[in-house]
């Protein structure tokens, strides 16, 4: 199989997908031998994990609607399902970044706050707004098919940008999760971005283009923000980027799917 400038054997593809499922979800998987391939090499497959998380949310949404629940409760249950599936991995990053960037005065202090497991006012507000916006968008969708398209597109595309972020920004600390993952190659970053962009076609041509433009603007802004605040990226900033990207795609989906 050949991805953009990235040739992998079938075994490597399976290894990379499995590694991303293990890292980005809490789904029960058997013990696997990844044969030395780390997250930096496998990050192109992150959209596959996102697609699966989106499918889980969509199935819960459709099941709830089938049993007569209104769109609001169905959307809430779908959100709960996706959060459980990921173990709040990205939400944790969002709250840590909000606390660190909002409360720290120096680069070192910001990184210290981000490492602290306690949540502050900035982090709590960021989490609340993230959940509120996502719930509101999903609750306004008119049927489970729209929920399926929106969730799959948002979860896949929001993970497709992560490899590029890791490629373009150096680790902000030498001992963090991101530093331990290693360097992401340009080929791997491109492969992940392309794979993550494909499900955006579920939003129609106009929706896909709008989502790509918005994702590009958010990516550039967050890239500049992280450089300014901490001089690079960490696992928390990667999680925060996923969250804001997911929200962006959901907002585009709410317009594209209703027109």
From Swiss-Prot:
InterPro entries named among the record's database cross-references: CobS
A Pfam family this chain is assigned to: CobS
GO BP of this protein: cobalamin biosynthetic process
Entry keyword annotation includes Cell membrane: yes
NCBIfam families listed in its UniProt record: cobS
HAMAP family with a match to the protein in the record: CobS (MF_00719)
Name of this chain's protein: Adenosylcobinamide-GDP ribazoletransferase
Origin species: Mesorhizobium japonicum (strain LMG 29417 / CECT 9101 / MAFF 303099) (Mesorhizobium loti (strain MAFF 303099))
Gene: cobS
